[in-house]
Amino acid sequence: MTDTGREGLQNREEGFELPLMSLREVVMFPRSIVPLFVGREASIKAIESAISDYGKKIFLVAQREPELEKPGPEDLFEVGTVSKILQLLRLPDGTIKVLFEGLYRARWDGTADAIIGADDAYPRVRVTRIEQESSEDDDEALVRATHEALDEYGKINKKLAQETLVAISALSDAARLADAIMPHLKVDYRRKQELLEVESGAERLEKVYELLQGEIAVASLEKRIKSRVKNQMERNQREYYLNEQIKAIHKEMGREDDPQAEVNELEARLAEKSMPEEAREKALREMKKLRQMPPSSAEYTVVRNYVDWILDLPWNTLKETEIDIDNARSILDADHYGLEKPKERILEYLAVQKLVNRLKGPILCLVGPPGVGKTSLAKSVAKATGREFVRLSLGGVRDEAEIRGHRRTYVGALPGKIIQSLKRVKHNNPLFCLDEIDKMSTDFRGDPSSALLEVLDPEQNSTFNDHYLDMDYDLSQVFFITTANSLHSIPLPLQDRMEIIRLPGYLETEKRRIAHDFLLPKQVEAHGLAASNLRISDNAVLEIIRSYTREAGVRNLEREIASVCRKAAMQVVEAGDKEKTLTVSRQNLGNFLGVKKYRHGEREDTSQVGVCTGLAWTEMGGELLVVETALMPGSGRVEITGKLGDVMTESAKAALSYLRSRSDLFGLRPDFHKEIDIHVHVPEGATPKDGPSAGITLATSMVSALLGIPVRNDVAMTGEITLRGRVLPIGGLREKLLAAHRGQIGKVLVPRENEKDLKEVPGEILKGLEIVFVDHVDEVLPQALMAQAESIFGGRTQSTPLYAKLRKDAQDGGATMPTAQ
């Protein structure tokens, strides 16, 4: 210890230096002896320094916030207690047990400047002793009243040792009496700190007396409660003893099956179960019925099953969920390749739920063709949010009772599938995937889609009423995700309750990536092969996609890869060499999968009159659609074949009406159609086709046939036509452009209003295509027909019919005329 420090210990006015140790939720009072466990490194260093350099004296002060591990000067109170270390015991875990004796109050500045040696392992501060005011004569009444209150408190609180009471009763000084009583009162450490800072002994004792009176009131109440509980327990024990005697009597009489025991068990379960008051009251009423029924009656079993259902449901049981956006994004990316927009929308939804901390919001509906990952995406969302995953298939459901349950009046009645699933998962906040919601149907038993209106309405599903339960059940904590292949069969009111997220079909590039990264490793492992046993080239995978599957998803692609793996496994086993390596290329793919199953539309080999290439959208993706028009002598009949739907048939009629209305523009007589028959055919006649987007394709094919001008075979088009020749926007542009790219089309004519949709088309597809935006058929024909634009629309004189001139242009092939590629 320094000389300055020794002088400081004797100079109370100027203050003296001591090590400081902060306490958590403990306030040290003068003349009190308290054992403390010390584990913080700075506190241990302060104690060691106090023993070696400061005569075992240390300054103990309480923290304002006990959670802080390393409190700063501003985190400590200014008033503490100079204490002496009486005993120290080091424990095996590195902590120490120290016995402190409080000596007197002291104060420090409570600022960073007051700390001496701020860089040391423990703080040292300069403290000033707080002098104690002397007691006055009129304090005697307060001291006597406090002694009486302490005696009363000691009679109620048996935890207070008799020796402690005797020692305290010998004190007559107000200040010392207050300091002696305070450590034994159950009050918050902040309240104790307030009393420590009171310098007047009489004032401090008065506050202690008030606290003592409050503790007496609380202790008296606790005593009454304990007495009441004890009496209740004695009464319960007496009832238990009598019930056991009754059981023993039944056993002696050979009646071991006591029906009341079963009801008692149900009542015990009910007492432990957390549930709404309505459900509890209903269960109690049903149990009263059970007590009055003979177990052999049929009604007894019905009531017993009903009570079991009430007790088994997770009314208020919620599973801990955690929404971590980064983790959710990682899970979605790991489980699904592509699908960026759907995944982004799901992450946005989860982010909102994390901020508002409630689930009330839109119900998500994932719409897309089969095999694109709708159900597995819902499963990944459950995994990302930590919820139980429940899948309920609605395909073929036609009975409303499947959703709402049967009324108890029916034999074998049960709750609906939703309540049954909640009982199975034992939590009230799972993720519910209502699969194939578009496959429900209606019959005389009701409309299940109407029952779902309540389930999928965030404003109503907190009071979902199942017919079997016949009471409200809260579904607002359930995360609902529905899936569908199409929205056409979903009623509009049900659609209105859901937020639609569309999952488009995969592009070929995405399928190829999915095959290499997900499907191939999965199937290789499933078939017992090593990764080195089988190698499939990119071209082979692309050939499988194009020639052996026709789908928007990847289910059939996985089946074909599994077939390749089976063939490979057979060859490895037959060769008897587990290290054998098989390479599948485009050339030998047929050895594994046989002949090709499908052919995708490709462009025509040559440019022909009346043959025009259009673009179509199907659930399996985009396709090239060839339209053929033939003319023959006749009486004006129009024949349309190829299994076309009503909309496509009407598009053909609209295209023909447009041509007739502008016959003079093309150099045709107004009554040209009366002398010929027009036959429009769309090949692959067994395949149904419909939709308005083939309008300009039909019109171009007819113009080509009427004028005898070939249509360029490297041009494809899509767009709806009006009677005025306007070109209207279409859907599925992404898939249609993929089909054009795959079919080696060079130029695609697209409605101008679809220009905004190009943002969703991958750049690798656009790179090989020339996209031309059109507003009118007048812009389509010069791009598609093998003649100059002036040749089609330039001549209007009757002396030189355009029909003959354009045919001559097409046959001669002028230098400025586009050539077919």
Curated annotation (Swiss-Prot):
Family of this protein: Belongs to the peptidase S16 family.
Keyword terms: ATP-binding, Cytoplasm, Hydrolase, Nucleotide-binding, Protease, Serine protease, Stress response
Q: Explain the induction of this protein.
A: By heat shock.
Q: Where is the Lon N-terminal domain?
A: 18-216
Q: Where in the cell is it found?
A: Cytoplasm
Summary of the function given for this chain in its UniProt record: ATP-dependent serine protease that mediates the selective degradation of mutant and abnormal proteins as well as certain short-lived regulatory proteins. Required for cellular homeostasis and for survival from DNA damage and developmental changes induced by stress. Degrades polypeptides processively to yield small peptide fragments that are 5 to 10 amino acids long. Binds to DNA in a double-stranded, site-specific manner.
GO process terms (BP):
cellular response to heat; protein quality control for misfolded or incompletely synthesized proteins
Q: Does the keyword Disulfide bond apply?
A: no
The record's Pfam families line, in alphabetical order, gives: AAA, Lon_C, Lon_lid, LON_substr_bdg
Gene (UniProt): lon
* Xref: NCBIfam families: lon, PRK10787.1
| Record's subunit section | Homohexamer. Organized in a ring with a central cavity.
**GO MF assignments:** ATP binding; ATP hydrolysis activity; ATP-dependent peptidase activity; sequence-specific DNA binding; serine-type endopeptidase activity
Q: Which InterPro entries match?
A: AAA+_ATPase, ATPase_AAA_core, Lon_bac, Lon_bac/euk-typ, Lon_lid, Lon_proteolytic, Lon_Prtase, Lon_prtase_N
Record field: catalytic activity: Hydrolysis of proteins in presence of ATP
The top of its lineage is: Bacteria, Pseudomonadati, Thermodesulfobacteriota, Desulfovibrionia, Desulfovibrionales
Give the protein's recorded name: Lon protease
Q: Which residues bind ATP?
A: G368, P369, P370, G371, V372, G373, K374, T375
